[in-house]
Amino acid sequence: MRQLLGGVFSLRKIDMSWAKTLMLGVFDYYNMKTIEAHQILPDEAHWTIEIPDLSRPWSPELAPAWRWSYEPWTYPIPRDSVAVTNLDALRGKRITEVMRWEQDEWEMFAGAGPDVTEQERRVVPLGILLASDNSLGPVVNLQIGSGLWRDDVSEWHPWGTSQGVKR
């Protein structure tokens, strides 16, 4: 482990199933079938849902946020869609507010969006959030300018109503 500004980081050897996908061209360039590579891991306080365990062979169950690097895109929205989200959502807390602002842009927050500070905001591929939480499926059907809300235990509701949304 090594302490650097902003946290403690460690190294872990990665499985070849990840290396062949992430190390584009390295195997051809060096004319090798295997190359030892390591993942830089943050401490638990800085872990987020898109950080996979690269020491284990890739599978969509173990690394759902990376599914679209290996599988075809299955949603009726652009693959390069993004979401402005917050660190709480990226650390696994339940997303409770969603708005679709553009063809390929959403806001998705765990907690009240207006309470999210600029320092807590992140822009991430929407696929990361969709793959990490199956309950987010209805957000891909939102019309531009529409939103959904829920509390920690309820189903999705369109903004301005208390009736649930069909999945």
List the model feature ranges, each with a label.
Residues 2-167:
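Acidic, proline/glycine-rich low-complexity IDRs
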